[in-house]
Every structure is written in structure tokens, then in C-alpha cells.
UniProtKB/Swiss-Prot annotation:
Catalysed reactions listed for this entry: L-glutamyl-tRNA(Gln) + L-glutamine + ATP + H2O = L-glutaminyl-tRNA(Gln) + L-glutamate + ADP + phosphate + H(+); L-aspartyl-tRNA(Asn) + L-glutamine + ATP + H2O = L-asparaginyl-tRNA(Asn) + L-glutamate + ADP + phosphate + 2 H(+)
Entry similarity comment: Belongs to the GatC family.
Tagged with keyword Cell cycle: no
Record protein name field: Aspartyl/glutamyl-tRNA(Asn/Gln) amidotransferase subunit C
Assembly behavior: Heterotrimer of A, B and C subunits.
Lineage, broadest ranks: Bacteria, Pseudomonadati, Chlorobiota, Chlorobiia, Chlorobiales
One protein family per Pfam: GatC
GO molecular function list: asparaginyl-tRNA synthase (glutamine-hydrolyzing) activity; ATP binding; glutaminyl-tRNA synthase (glutamine-hydrolyzing) activity
Function: Allows the formation of correctly charged Asn-tRNA(Asn) or Gln-tRNA(Gln) through the transamidation of misacylated Asp-tRNA(Asn) or Glu-tRNA(Gln) in organisms which lack either or both of asparaginyl-tRNA or glutaminyl-tRNA synthetases. The reaction takes place in the presence of glutamine and ATP through an activated phospho-Asp-tRNA(Asn) or phospho-Glu-tRNA(Gln).
InterPro entries registered for this protein in UniProt: Asp/Glu-ADT_sf_sub_c (IPR036113), GatC (IPR003837)
Record EC number: 6.3.5.-
Broad class of enzyme this protein falls into: ligase
Organism (species): Chlorobium phaeovibrioides (strain DSM 265 / 1930) (Prosthecochloris vibrioformis (strain DSM 265))
Nucleotide-binding is among the record's keywords: yes
Gene symbol of the encoding locus: gatC
Record key words, sorted: ATP-binding, Ligase, Nucleotide-binding, Protein biosynthesis
Length: 95
């Protein structure tokens, strides 16, 4: 299958696009290059090859979660430059 300049012009009209003659010719060449590549991929023998979603065998490479004791409220507030009651005080950001 190949794309002609008439095909590109027709598709451009459907998409409400405007191409100059040079742009349409370039688009024709680029689309034909893509289609040639797809034809090359279609020639590859994939008989007996299982479909893959990932080329790696690794499933989950993240570390395991480890439970830790939470920091006490008083300890957290002791590191804050300013606090009020049980809360951090920060400068007002919005007007």
C-alpha cells in the first residue's frame, strides 16, 4: 500500500488542514516511509512468540514497605520554627 498526493490532499481536507504543494509532497513521502516500515514489521515471523506487555521478566522491583513508628506530634512541633497548640504555623500565602 502506498499513499498518493491525492490521498494526502483528501485527508487534509477532511481534517480541515491546508498544506502547500511542497508540504503535501513531504507528507506523502513521510507517510509512505511509515507504511513501508509497517510492511517490514508485518514480514517478521512471530509464530510461537507470546505477546508481551514488557520485555523484562521483573515484576515489581520496588523495595518492600517497612512499618515504622510515627513521629510524635510534640517531637515534630519541636522542630518547627513556629507552632500554635498542636499545629504548625506558617506565613499566609494567599491574600
Amino acid at each position: 500500500m502506498s499513499v498518493t498526493i491525492d490521498d494526502v490532499t483528501y485527508i487534509a481536507e477532511l481534517a480541515r488542514l491546508r498544506f502547500s504543494d511542497d508540504e503535501a509532497l513531504k507528507m506523502t513521502d513521510e507517510l509512505n516511509t511509515i507504511l513501508h516500515y509497517v510492511d517490514t514489521l508485518n514480514e517478521v515471523d512471530t509464530e510461537g512468540v507470546l505477546p508481551l506487555s514488557n520485555i523484562h521478566d521483573q515484576k515489581n522491583v520496588l523495595r518492600a514497605d517497612e512499618e515504622h513508628e510515627p513521629i510524635a506530634n510534640a517531637a515534630a512541633l519541636s522542630n518547627a520554627p513556629d507552632s500554635q497548640d498542636r499545629f504548625f504555623r506558617v506565613p499566609k500565602v494567599l491574600g
